[in-house]
Amino acid sequence: MITRLLSGSIKSKGLSYKLLDELNEELLEDVDIFVETGVYSMIPANILSKPRICSLGFHETPLPEGKGWAPIRWTLENNKKHLVVSLYQLSEKLDDGGIVYQVNVPISKGDHYPVLETKRQKGIQECFSLFLDELQSGVLVIRPQTGEECFSDRRFKHSSELDATKTLKELWDEIRVCDLERYPPYFVLDDIKVVLNYKVIKLGDI
């Protein structure tokens, strides 16, 4: 999905691109900029240094805050009003390169996982499109990350378990960050597991 959005932005600017099914130095010959999406492992230095200009990636937190996994969860846990999409230069360290562009995507208290995921994708597309505009105007500014560094842990299936002693209002941020199809929220009651399914409806629409 993200790849399709980015390729659409590239084509709309009249630029050329190629999609890579694997990472090797030969495939990056004659490439100016390499952009990774959906790569969940560190990319070797020989790959990152191959493009003529730079290698870039996206992370949905205001780097250096929220490095690592589960950026949407980090955003909610830290009571942020926006999902911040950072386009940054890839390096040998995790989420450590300079910032190329950042976009703030407003989020509301009623946004649950499908809405948050859609906003994330649109934020990435907007961020990338604005970056391309600047690039075509002859501008490419890479700023060092500033601020306090912190990391977010990886989510697993058990990360969707809720504390049954808390109220639904207290649990809402934990509930809405769960993917209902893959990792639905649940709680354990004595010897049974209760899996939650829900729908968000604005009161004015009832």
Predicted regions and their residues:
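One-carbon transfer enzymes
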Residues: 1-206
